Amino acid sequence: MSRLIIVFIVVTMICSATALPSKKIIDEDEEDEKRSADVAGAVIDGASLSFDILKTVLEALGNVKRKIAVGVDNESGKTWTALNTYFRSGTSDIVLPHKVPHGKALLYNGQKDRGPVATGAVGVLAYLMSDGNTLAVLFSVPYDYNWYSNWWNVRIYKGKRRADQRMYEELYYNLSPFRGDNGWHTRNLGYGLKSRGFMNSSGHAILEIHVSKA
């Protein structure tokens, strides 16, 4: 009987020792997921939006050749409600933040399609503002920099309009987009609003936009 008790104790100790590292790994994985959720897809104080925050969003995507972190600060005096994101190229695992009140900023990301495919991260996100008009943001991070460059744009459309291929073409080709040239650019958006934005020229891109009263 005593031998059986000793064997039982030894087996219990071994099982406990192997279970602890597994639990630690699971806890670390859960913590990583929480950190990602706290950044990409989050709504933060507009005053805290910075390059450092956007770099954290990029880092959460891991080792991806073409990726982008997007931050849009709402100082418009209006509440924004998410409509959709249209991807011309690439994808995102993040759901567009649903409500962005005045004084807050939304965080979002995009990346190339998974696998050995030559795609960039190119798309448009659309928000319905509380005045009934639509805020649209274009981001374009190409795969081939021999032929293309980073581009971005921000515009307001009259009425409610979802992002789609047509909106992408308008913002990319026709409505004076800004090159991602590591500099700040400003624009009068109409409807009593203006924008100030920055995009770098890297394949690991950050796009920071502030929309405020004109």
From Swiss-Prot:
A motif (Cell attachment site, crucial for protein stability) lies at residues 179-181. The record marks 179, 195 as: Interacts with the lipid membrane. Changing residue 148 to A: Inhibition of direct binding of sphingomyelin. Phosphocholine binds at residues 89, 122, 140, 142, 168, 172-173. Residues 38-47 are annotated as: Plays an important role in the hemolytic activity. One of its GO terms (biological process) is pore complex assembly. Residues 20-35 form a propeptide. GO terms for cellular component: extracellular region; nematocyst; other organism cell membrane; pore complex. Its main location: secreted. The record marks 147-148 as: Important in the initial contact with the lipid membrane. It comes from the Eukaryota. It is found in: Secreted; Nematocyst; Target cell membrane. The keyword Signal applies. Keywords: Cleavage on pair of basic residues, Cytolysis, Ion transport, Membrane, Nematocyst, Secreted, Signal, Target cell membrane, Target membrane, Toxin, Transmembrane, Transport. Pfam families: Anemone_cytotox. Residues 1-19 form the signal peptide. Residues 46-65 are annotated as: N-terminal region. InterPro entries: Actinoporin_PFT (IPR050677), Anemon_actinoporin-like (IPR009104), Cytolysin/lectin (IPR015926). The keyword Transport applies. GO terms for molecular function: channel activity; toxin activity. Pore-forming protein that forms cations-selective hydrophilic pores of around 1 nm and causes cardiac stimulation and cytolysis. Pore formation is a multi-step process that involves specific recognition of membrane sphingomyelin (but neither cholesterol nor phosphatidylcholine) using aromatic rich region and adjacent phosphocholine (POC) binding site, firm binding to the membrane (mainly driven by hydrophobic interactions) accompanied by the transfer of the N-terminal region to the lipid-water interface and finally pore formation after oligomerization of monomers. Belongs to the actinoporin family. Sea anemone subfamily. Composed of a long N-terminal alpha-helix and a core region rich in beta-sheet structures. Before the pore formation, the alpha-helix binds the lipid membrane, partitions into the lipid-water interface and stabilizes the monomeric molecule on the membrane. Finally, it traverses the bilayer, thus forming the transmembrane pore. Octamer or nonamer in membranes. Monomer in the soluble state. This is DELTA-actitoxin-Aeq1a.
